[in-house]
Amino acid sequence: MDVPKPLPSSLSSFAAPGDVMVRPLLLKPQWMNGLSERLLVSHYVNNYGGALRRLNAIRKRLAGLDWARAPAFEINGLKREELIAASSVILHEIYFDSLGGKGDSPPTGREEPPAELARALERDFGSVAAWRAEFTAIAKALAGGSGWAILAWSARLGRLVNQWAADHAHGLAAATPILALDMYEHAYHLDFGAKAAAYVDQAMGNLNWERIGARYRSAIGEQSEDKLFLPYGSPAQEEARISPEELKAALADAGDRRPVLLDVCLPKDLARRTDMLPGATVRAPGALARWVDDLPRGRPIAVYCICGFQVSGKTVTELRQRGYDAKAVSGGITAWHAIGGATVPLELSTYEDLAQVR
């Protein structure tokens, strides 16, 4: 059997020195039914981003530890916190990946599991409806406390299992999560207050079954579609994308290889914005022909929008067709926020379609 190709994930960063890299949002927050953009962005930036930043800080502490002399309490404390932070990062990535309907359009609430996964759910739970009833009951039972409801593949048990987890590090040994529902209060309080059950019902109507199915195929050793794990509209070519971490390092260069920053955003989306990356120029993507000749030919160009979807992707494609060294910032300014990147107040004086901003 061929070795399955791993899904694109910040998990790969664990095998290399340095920071674990942020994973872009694959959903459009404003498209979710019954889950507000404010809730989802706050959850991603503050809770997922906070866990990611905490994990990287812990890893730096561990890298400098003198293992021969470090006291047991320090080793225990750091390794415990590393486990909690790493598990939080991974479960949050699976959670956000699992939401978003079909990805290229708002969820309808009528999406169904792909055939292979549906057959597995029927085999292991009797029916898709029976699985859903059990999974949602587990999630709702966690209301008022904290934890995760997880659907995981266990090779040892030879089946899919619904898992109750009281915290980030509470998991079935050697099982591979394919769906995770965050039941910590931060996942729902802004929209639902204490009504956790209402949040569960709304979240279950926003699932992206294509990506959940891809995780299942990867877990059982089959190939998965990598394109499902890129933000919709993001350039497929790796050389046309730059991570927020790579951009942060590149911006530290004071020379002629320092990227030119372009903030491209539709007028209707700018109305929701308050900040931008330092040194960026805000341009209207629909007016590219009017400003493209102002760009320097000898400098790399980093293009970002809110979440790194088709607005920045289309702009980068057009710039590269015109011979510019342009790259889309994966995850947009939302992922930049999640890594704690600096911003300044939004300045719209250069925006060509300012009259359309509402």
Please name every model-derived segment:
Residues 224-253, 259, 267-302, 307-358:
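Rhodanese-like catalytic fold shared by cysteine-dependent sulfurtransferases
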Residues 2-229:
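Feature for soluble, non-membrane regions of globular proteins
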